[in-house]
Amino acid sequence: MTEIHQVLVGAGRTDAITSMARSIRSSLRKIGPSEIYAQHPAPGVDDVYLLEKLGHSTRSKRIIIFHASGGNPAVYNFLDACSDPVILIFHN
């Protein structure tokens, strides 16, 4: 089963990008495993994991959705080293 996870730079309780990611995750969980990871989750955001917990996969059955909203070298370096397919959602 393919896992589809989302990556955010930051995650808040009520911000628009995190809310969108939660909505997408809810739909994705109907077809398989799906979580949200962020470099900077705000305190109290318990449903988003630290990006470092996602790790790099040697499996080919994982897709990453990246919500690009601002520059963060650590996130870009993680994605650059990632062998998984990455889907970009650009937030302006």
Where are these regions (language model features)?
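N-terminal pre-catalytic "stem/leader" segment of glycosyltransferase-like enzymes
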Residues: 1-58
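Extended catalytic core of nucleotide-activated donor transferases of GT-like folds
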Residues: 44-92
